Amino acid sequence: MTDLTTQEAIVLERPGKITLTNVSIPKISDPNEVIIQIKATGICGSDIHYYTHGRIANYVVESPMVLGHESSGIVALIGENVKTLKVGDRVALEPGIPDRFSPEMKEGRYNLDPNLKFAATPPFDGTLTKYYKTMKDFVYKLPDDVSFEEGALIEPLSVAIHANKLAKIKFGARCVVFGAGPIGLLAGKVASVFGAADVVFVDLLENKLETARQFGATHIVNSGDLPHGVTVDSVIKKAIGKKGADVVFECSGAEPCVRAGIEVCKAGGTIVQVGMGQEEIQFPISIIPTKELTFQGCFRYCQGDYSDSIELVSSRKLSLKPFITHRYSFKDAVEAFEETSHHPLNNIKTIIEGPE
């Protein structure tokens, strides 16, 4: 007899060990809740970091946790107060649920709510299951021309959208992106769509830089392969002008990149710090006031970012399909994590299909 109370899930048992494990199927307990049948989930760098290290900053995996937060699917069940969605709707889901009455929620900056419940961030389970329960306010209908795979990648795209909004990108802007990982690639691509004239990518790895070139980089700089005495900022300024960059997206979290970003940003320019690295680093703070730089933190996304991301993809101003390099069935998800963690250079985005 089929067990209708449990479902398979991809569970991080402890650092280095992921299993396919049975967990309870969620039930509606609040009239504003929605249950989604998950159809596609992207593997995020945070998933890999929890898998390999068991923690990110102060978020520590202390008990088994379902992984995954970049997901899309079909509405399977709705609470009685849900009027904007119906069973069968194709949707993307925002994985962070704030306190609906928090000051941050009222300000439209719910990503800063200290009580935010974010999928696959300890102690909260993620979306790599067949059915996942969330709140109606954080479920977005997908247009018919946006696939489930693209719907899953609305989540990282929203990070890039948020970063560009914080940067206040203007037409003709000169931008530099440090770190050519998925978020960096998307941040640069969005900057181009928003009207940036130059998008320079900086990374240590040549294959990542070649990928950045394929995604529209106007210039690439291999910071690990410069002649003795040549600095990153001097190479960038030679390419885009000696005044430097209007906007710097720091997407690596690495101290040398933070320092170089401060050097290369023009007077009056903006640095958007997207990457999270060591808790403490050293950088030339005196440059920030003397150049009147805006040093802007960026954390996930908030009001309007998901909707704008879906519109950008649906309008075909930006395609997410080229970012998908690997696909796995749900039953092969453990292999997907092992492959992604052991061979990251061959991967931009891995998609895991939802369970059958």
From Swiss-Prot:
Family in the record: Belongs to the zinc-containing alcohol dehydrogenase family.
Name used for this protein in its record: D-xylulose reductase
UniProt binding sites for Zn(2+): C44, H69, E155
UniProt organism field: Saccharomyces cerevisiae (strain ATCC 204508 / S288c) (Baker's yeast)
Catalytic activity, as annotated: xylitol + NAD(+) = D-xylulose + NADH + H(+)
Gene that encodes it: XYL2
Cofactor(s) this protein cannot do without: Zn(2+)
Matching CDD domains: sorbitol_DH
GO process terms (BP): D-xylose metabolic process; L-arabinose catabolic process to xylulose 5-phosphate; sorbitol catabolic process; xylulose biosynthetic process
Enzyme class, UniProt record, top EC level: oxidoreductase
Classification via InterPro entries: ADH-like_C (IPR013149), ADH-like_N (IPR013154), ADH_Zn_CS (IPR002328), GroES-like_sf (IPR011032), NAD(P)-bd_dom_sf (IPR036291), PKS_ER (IPR020843), SDH-like (IPR045306)
